[in-house]
């Protein structure tokens, strides 16, 4: 088997929707890409999107990272098959019971956005394998092409104004930069706007995971500066801190997060890491996103920031999984990485089935603690091997 191309990803999602009409909905995003492609999201769950909380899973934001779209397509197929056959799932030594699978689909909606950036993936697979961005023409048909979609979201997007000059924030306003051009405006790109549209259209989404590669790590907010839980006034909305935001090794500014939220996201990230490790022993450490380097315009921080910028919006907890050790591993290696992603994301979903807050209410971190998903497996329950 080989990596799925853009058309095969689309066909796979459509085929799953046709095969499991009672537990899926195929959602067409409103904004065509620069090359005219229409992207789709597969909603998985037994209850309407308005009744239960949702988990948004993104893949393929960066074109050269070939594993994440395949991993999300295969996770969707695994969950739907296991649910339909009343079986559990096994990824290496990580097991989930049939009860786990049934509860995930009954108590959550999963929004599988397997390939956010199809133009970029097509270009990468057509002979420019390290291509990262989308395919916007930045200079009227010249050779300055593409926006880094994970620098284009409306979170501290204007890094020149919102970060210290010596912060080292990993983005650029140079439209000819090959890797991290932020775009001409926040959410300028149709691919970015499609993600925003999903969050706007389905306000019960509470969890957001952007799957990337290739440094094995599980990241949580914030990516703008080190976290702190004591001073709410130090936050991304406070322009007074723009001259010092993101500066390394100083205490002039740190990004505020509530203690409950910090406990919650580190606990859930830890759950994902434990499940990944059980697949084949590979370690995905948990880290605050800023620990890699300061960023602006990232999808996970944008998702989490929405509630702070507008308290009427429900809180969405953002994560990034960086999977595997290379952008395009051999297929044999990719299969193991796909199992790791499947294990981590299923563990997250199993954990958050115990967290069903009303819109705008913060779930208790204590609900994340307790027995692992495997402990609910009844003797003799069947498994589907992934």
Regions found by a protein language model. Give the residues of each.
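Short glycine- and acidic-rich boundary segments immediately preceding or forming the N-terminal edge
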Residues: 1-39
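Loop/turn elements at helix/coil->beta-strand transitions in domains of secreted/extracellular proteins
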Residues: 21-24, 37-39, 52-54, 106-111, ...
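Divalent metal-coordination and catalytic microenvironments
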Residues: 36, 60, 112, 149, ...
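Short beta-strand-to-loop junctions in surface cap/lid or active-site-entrance loops
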Residues: 41-50
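Short, solvent-exposed loop/turn and secondary-structure capping segments
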Residues: 52-53, 67-70, 122-128, 160-162, ...
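Short helix-loop-beta-strand segments that form the rim/entrance of peptidase-like active sites
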Residues: 68-124
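Glycine-rich, aromatic-flanked loop segments that form ligand/cofactor-binding clefts
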Residues: 102, 108, 113-151
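Metallocarboxypeptidase
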Residues: 142, 153-369
């Amino acid at each position: 088997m080989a990596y799925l191309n853009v058309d095969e990803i689309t066909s796979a999602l459509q085929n799953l929707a046709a095969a499991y009409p009672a537990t899926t909905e195929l959602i067409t995003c409103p904004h065509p890409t620069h090359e005219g492609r229409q992207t789709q999201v597969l909603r998985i769950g037994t209850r309407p999107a308005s009744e239960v909380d949702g988990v948004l899973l993104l893949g393929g934001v960066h074109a050269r990272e070939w594993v994440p779209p395949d991993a999300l397509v295969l996770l969707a197929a695994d969950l739907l098959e296991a649910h339909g056959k009343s079986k559990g799932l096994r990824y290496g030594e990580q097991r989930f019971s049939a009860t786990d699978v049934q509860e995930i689909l009954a108590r959550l909606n999963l929004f599988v956005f397997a390939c956010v950036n199809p133009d970029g993936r097509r270009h990468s697979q057509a002979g420019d394998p390290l291509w990262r961005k989308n395919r916007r023409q930045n200079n009227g048909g010249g050779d300055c092409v593409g926006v880094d979609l994970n620098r284009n979201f409306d979170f501290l997007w204007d890094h020149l104004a919102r970060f210290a000059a010596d912060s080292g924030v990993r983005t650029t306003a140079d439209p000819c930069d090959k890797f991290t051009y932020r775009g001409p405006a926040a959410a300028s790109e149709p691919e970015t706007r499609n993600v925003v549209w999903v969050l706007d259209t389905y306000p019960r989404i509470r969890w957001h995971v952007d799957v990337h590669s290739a440094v094995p790590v599980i990241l949580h907010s914030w990516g703008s500066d080190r976290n702190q839980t004591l001073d709410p006034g130090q936050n991304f909305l406070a322009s007074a801190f723009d001259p010092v935001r993101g500066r390394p090794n100083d205490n002039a500014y740190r990004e505020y997060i509530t203690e409950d939220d910090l406990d919650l996201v580190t606990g859930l990230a830890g759950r994902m890491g434990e499940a990944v490790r059980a697949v084949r022993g590979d370690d995905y450490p948990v880290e605050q996103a800023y620990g890699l380097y300061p960023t602006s315009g990232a999808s996970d921080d944008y998702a989490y920031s929405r509630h702070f910028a507008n308290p009427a919006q429900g809180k969405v907890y953002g994560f990034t999984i960086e999977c595997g050790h290379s952008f395009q591993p051999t297929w044999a290696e990719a299969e193991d990485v796909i199992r790791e992603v499947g294990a981590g994301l299923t563990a997250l979903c199993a954990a958050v089935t115990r967290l069903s807050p009303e819109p705008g209410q913060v779930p208790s971190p204590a609900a994340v603690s307790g027995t692992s998903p495997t402990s609910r497996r009844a003797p003799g329950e069947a498994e589907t091997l992934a």
